[in-house]
């Protein structure tokens, strides 16, 4: 028997992200990133939660309440439109087609802006939310940029929290493992995520396994660890031959996402106005 761990610790084990300078991102209805730190942070940040790996290493968590819900609503609208014309399309095919379309868009989403706030976001200071899509008259308004901006904004609040780590605390992130619905369409969520974080994002075939499997691995570790540390055990005994695909960020992609994030931060007043005036 091993003592039960919380979702954070078992999730780290299930995704083999217990080593310093690594982390994992779970992205679906909500999204959170957990980064294993090399040292304590210089101060407390209300935007970040602090947990530990099962081995006791410090982990910073950036958690966002909202991720794919708003994008799912838009894709449902496209499905309704097609159905109105008598076109039958498989839901999985529609998601895959539209997600892949996003990769044809501009790195900065063509000047478009969206917020996926169905509920509040503590990282950006909102106790409630209003889903929004905003553009200027000269923005590059096309399908590719429309889908891309909704994928990008799904990571906006989380990115705001991670920027505290990377830009204010100089935390190095060498690799991220992604899991959750955002990564279901091969390569798309990974690409957006890699450019958002500025680090390679890996998705393993076991990424769908969650905390229950992590608990089982911890129990097996307690029985069979020998002289191995937890990260050595996971790397050599569990994940040594795992199948994974990694996508690295690009200079253009990183710069484009940073341009989008400037627009995202500057537009938060629009979100606040919507909350104040749309009751």
Place the predicted regions along the sequence by residue:
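Active-site core segments that coordinate phosphate-bearing ligands/cofactors
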Residues: 1-177, 182-279
